[in-house]
């Protein structure tokens, strides 16, 4: 079974855009099509982003917290990995995702962030639509 790290932007998109590829990935996750790998840092970032004022029109604080708990229930929660020998992410704030993907040896780091997608030559990075298509093959 494939294993994947979903970037925070994918998890947020899945919640606020229920008809998109990111939301369909969560349906596939619940159907057992792949294993989701998360870490405390990823979960903390997800919670922090969903608590931002600009997301109030999409989700309440209570519903955001419930969503994070569902993600925890449906995922393998790994310890935050140590930093790698050198950053390779274009954005230092994304380095923890790269480190998690490397240490957990996932089949894909799934992101909608162009800077993360630019790492394709060094990591198995896919967009939500690409990863969804790979599950359907």
What are these model-predicted stretches?
Residues 1-38:
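Short, well-structured N-terminal submotif of metal-dependent ribonuclease cores
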Residues 15-16, 50, 120-123:
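Short, flexible helix/strand-to-coil boundary loops that buttress conserved ligand/catalytic motifs
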Residues 28-84:
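PIN-domain endoribonuclease scaffold, especially VapC-family toxins
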Residues 13-14, 56, 84-90:
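Short, flexible loop segments at the rims of nucleotide/cofactor-binding pockets, characterized by
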Residues 20, 37, 59-62, 88-95, ...:
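Residues at secondary-structure transition points
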Residues 25, 97-98:
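Short, hydrophobic alpha-helical packing/hinge segments within bilobed ligand-binding/sensory domains
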Residues 10-11, 42, 115-116:
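Alpha-helix capping/helix-boundary segments
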Residues 87, 95, 102-110, 114-137:
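Acidic, PIN/NYN-like endoribonuclease modules and their adjacent C-terminal/linker elements
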């Amino acid at each position: 079974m494939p294993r994947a790290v979903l970037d925070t932007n994918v998890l947020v998109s899945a919640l606020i855009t229920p008809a998109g590829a990111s939301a369909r990935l969560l349906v596939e996750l619940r159907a057992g099509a792949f294993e989701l790998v998360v870490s405390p840092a990823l979960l903390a970032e997800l919670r922090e982003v969903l608590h931002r004022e600009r997301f109030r029109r999409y989700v309440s604080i209570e519903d955001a917290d419930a969503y994070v708990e569902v993600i925890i229930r449906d995922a393998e929660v790994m310890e935050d990995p140590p930093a790698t020998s050198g950053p390779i992410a274009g954005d230092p704030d994304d380095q923890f995702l790269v480190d998690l993907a490397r240490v957990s040896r996932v089949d894909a780091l799934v992101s909608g962030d162009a800077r993360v997608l630019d790492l394709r030559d060094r990591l198995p990075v896919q967009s939500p639509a690409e990863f969804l298509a790979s599950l359907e093959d």
